[in-house]
């Protein structure tokens, strides 16, 4: 079930396929570096489109060529399968 809060064990198991993401304060967190602001903003635009299709939106920060993304399901108070799905989709965008 996508909106079920994941246990610590489930999160650790799923993170095996997300080795570059960290778990911090009940969120999946990753920092992305780009060569310039336009690349960073283009990346965020692609994520926005996917986020809308999932009806699940990231918490993010953009400072020039850096984007920091934090994923959690606010209604559930932690990490769910929706966060995992969005993290996988974000990684696919970054490395396409």
Curated annotation (Swiss-Prot):
<dbReference type="GO" id="GO:0006729">
    <property type="term" value="P:tetrahydrobiopterin biosynthetic process"/>
</dbReference>
<comment type="similarity">
    <text>Belongs to the pterin-4-alpha-carbinolamine dehydratase family.</text>
</comment>
<dbReference type="Pfam" id="PF01329">
    <property type="entry name" value="Pterin_4a"/>
</dbReference>
<protein>
    <recommendedName>
        <fullName>Putative pterin-4-alpha-carbinolamine dehydratase</fullName>
        <ecNumber>4.2.1.96</ecNumber>
    </recommendedName>
</protein>
<keyword id="KW-0456">Lyase</keyword>
<dbReference type="InterPro" id="IPR001533">
    <property type="entry name" value="Pterin_deHydtase"/>
</dbReference>
<dbReference type="GO" id="GO:0008124">
    <property type="term" value="F:4-alpha-hydroxytetrahydrobiopterin dehydratase activity"/>
</dbReference>
<dbReference type="InterPro" id="IPR036428">
    <property type="entry name" value="PCD_sf"/>
</dbReference>
């Amino acid at each position: 079930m996508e909106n079920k809060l994941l246990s610590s064990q489930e999160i650790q198991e799923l993170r095996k396929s997300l080795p570059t993401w960290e778990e911090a304060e009940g969120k999946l967190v990753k920092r992305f570096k780009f060569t310039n602001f336009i690349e960073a903003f283009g990346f965020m635009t692609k994520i926005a489109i996917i986020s809308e299709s999932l009806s699940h939106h990231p918490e993010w920060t953009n400072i020039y060529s850096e984007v920091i993304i934090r994923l959690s399901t606010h209604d559930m108070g932690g990490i769910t399968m929706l966060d995992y799905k969005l993290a996988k989709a974000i990684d696919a965008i970054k490395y396409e």
